[in-house]
């Protein structure tokens, strides 16, 4: 990669703030550009304190004092990526400040329109104040759109730089290591087995190459896409249990799922188009309905041809398929957030991890203060004891001392509700005792032996204004990717060791209870047991 010279990033324009502390909004022009930015301080009227329920979103340290010291220097690859990542960190903070400004301006408008306040003001004064606030809001919204563009550009830039680095420095490494594992047991695995024998601890055996999927694991309904991602003229290609499928809407608007391979010459159908509820192959124009039947063969006689299709349903904003051979279960599980929550983000990502390993990670919270030190667990203390409290026969419970409820919902779903009144402070509160909450849905669809399609949905029971701000989709995706990246480097390391023979469940302890129960459930499914554990 060519060397680069660092100059103050166009994405991180310097911003001036008023040094005086007041309850009003201070404005100064940035050193560059003609747009205005806003700083918010609050001692007198307590506006910031008034929004304490939103503090988790805005309690982020100003990162500008930690800018990389590379101004005017030639950069190597790692330094260039460090600068790009700093841009992302700065934009994260900047976007939060823009949002807080709009929220406080909105409250000031409400205060001006308050009938009690108007009793002491003339109509002219009220009009003047509203006109001023309207101007402030207009400029603040303009800044939000600028932030949105910056976020998009910064994320694209970082992704491009990381792709270049991977191409230049890491060609084929991951594929070689993960796709061609050694079947022999490593020395470290032998040591772990010896330690297990000495301690007498009970372990699960999860080691070696990922075995073929049990047909019994396929006999469940699997969520594969969000309704919002499947328009009438779009397709969603997926991989499920190492088979390619494509989802699209039929003429009646209902979703269907067919094998993503044309019966004629095996061309991927998702490269084509959807015409009047039929998917058209881009090679010779053959068209298929949602049940897999070929309805059109241009330039030749229509033959009776059908490709494989799967049962496919739509419920509560999600698309589901049944990939198994048994008749589909008559009822789909509900994955809706609890009453009072509003969905703010729905994201889909493909991750290079076996889906069971990813579920192990999501069902474990004890790792948070050690792994997520730069995201949601920043500042968390390490408790002397972490416990997961659950019914004897359940796959759900709550974490002590964390205010978090969690549930594993077969076959591959994790639901969690997190109390976020005071992030970074552990006070032993239960989820119910917290005033504000984050609800998360994680779906870990088994794409292939070393690949997972992750569906993530985030809901809040506060700050509904965030739903309508234009840049929030980028911001939520950035947050989710930050957290996942902290996990992935560890889980990929586990996967490499596992493929080489190490047992990743060699020595479970008390706080591993939910993960162990998932593995016991999974083993019973793979065996084809009539009665599954923790199911009643």
From Swiss-Prot:
It comes from Arabidopsis thaliana (Mouse-ear cress). The keyword Transit peptide applies. [2Fe-2S] cluster binds at residues 262, 264, 281, 284. CDD domains: Rieske_RO_Alpha_Cao. It comes from the Eukaryota. It is an enzyme of class 1 (oxidoreductase). Consists of three domains A, B and C. The C-terminal C domain possesses catalytic function while the N-terminal A domain confers protein instability in response to chlorophyll b accumulation. SUPFAM superfamilies: Bet v1-like, ISP domain. GO terms for cellular component: chloroplast; chloroplast inner membrane; chloroplast thylakoid membrane; thylakoid membrane. One of its GO terms (biological process) is chlorophyll biosynthetic process. Keywords: 2Fe-2S, Chlorophyll biosynthesis, Chloroplast, Coiled coil, Iron, Iron-sulfur, Membrane, Metal-binding, NADP, Oxidoreductase, Plastid, Thylakoid, Transit peptide. It catalyses: chlorophyllide a + 2 NADPH + 2 O2 + 2 H(+) = chlorophyllide b + 2 NADP(+) + 3 H2O. Residues 221-321 form the Rieske domain. Residues 123-150 form a coiled coil. This is Chlorophyllide a oxygenase, chloroplastic.
């Amino acid at each position: 990669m060519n060397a680069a010279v660092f100059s103050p990033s166009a994405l991180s324009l310097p911003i001036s703030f008023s040094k005086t502390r007041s309850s009003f909004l201070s404005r100064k022009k940035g050193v560059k550009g003609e747009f205005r930015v806003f700083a918010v301080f609050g001692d007198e009227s307590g506006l910031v304190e008034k929004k304490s329920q939103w503090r988790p979103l805005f309690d982020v340290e100003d990162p500008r004092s930690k800018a990389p010291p590379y101004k005017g220097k030639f950069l190597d690859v790692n330094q260039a990526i460090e600068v790009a990542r700093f841009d992302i960190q700065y934009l994260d903070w900047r976007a939060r400040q823009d949002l807080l400004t709009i929220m406080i301006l909105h409250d000031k408008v409400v205060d001006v329109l308050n009938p009690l306040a108007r009793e002491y003001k003339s109509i002219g004064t009220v009009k003047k104040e509203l006109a001023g606030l309207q101007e402030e809001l207009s400029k603040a919204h303009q800044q939000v759109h600028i932030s949105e563009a910056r976020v998009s550009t910064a994320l694209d830039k970082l992704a491009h730089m990381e792709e270049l680095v991977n191409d230049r420095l890491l060609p084929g490494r991951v594929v070689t290591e993960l796709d061609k594992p050694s079947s022999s047991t490593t020395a470290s695995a032998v040591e772990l087995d010896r330690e297990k024998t000495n301690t007498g601890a009970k372990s699960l055996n999860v080691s070696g190459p990922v075995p073929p999927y049990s047909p019994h694991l396929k006999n469940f309904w699997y969520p594969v896409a969000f309704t919002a991602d499947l328009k009438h003229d779009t397709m969603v290609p997926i991989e499920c249990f190492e088979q390619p499928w494509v989802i699209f809407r039929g003429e009646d608007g209902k979703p269907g799922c067919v094998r993503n391979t044309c019966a004629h010459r095996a061309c991927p159908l998702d490269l084509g188009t959807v015409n009047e509820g039929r998917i058209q192959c881009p090679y010779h124009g053959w068209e298929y309905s949602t049940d897999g039947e070929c309805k059109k063969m241009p330039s030749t006689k229509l033959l009776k041809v059908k490709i494989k299709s799967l049962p496919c349903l739509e419920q509560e904003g999600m698309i589901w398929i049944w990939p198994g051979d048994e008749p589909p279960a008559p009822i789909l599980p509900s994955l809706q957030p609890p009453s009072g929550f509003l969905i703010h983000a729905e994201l889909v990502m493909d991750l290079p991890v076996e889906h069971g390993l990813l579920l192990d990670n999501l069902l474990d919270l004890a790792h948070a203060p050690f792994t997520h030190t730069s995201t949601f667990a920043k500042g968390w203390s390490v408790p002397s004891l972490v416990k997961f409290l659950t019914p004897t026969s359940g796959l759900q419970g709550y974490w002590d001392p964390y205010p978090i409820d969690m549930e594993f919902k077969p076959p591959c779903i994790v639901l969690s509700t997190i109390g976020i009144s005071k992030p970074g402070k552990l006070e032993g509160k239960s989820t119910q005792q917290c005033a504000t909450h984050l609800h998360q849905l994680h779906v870990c669809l088994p794409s292939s032996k070393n690949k997972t399609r992750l569906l993530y949905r985030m809901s809040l029971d506060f700050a509904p204004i965030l739903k309508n701000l234009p840049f929030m989709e980028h911001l939520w995706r950035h947050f989710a990717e930050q957290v996942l990246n902290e996990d992935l480097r560890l889980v990929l390391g586990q996967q490499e060791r596992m493929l080489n023979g190490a047992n990743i469940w060699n020595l479970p302890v008390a706080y591993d209870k939910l993960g162990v129960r998932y593995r016991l459930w999974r083993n019973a499914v793979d065996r084809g047991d009539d009665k599954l554990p923790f199911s009643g």
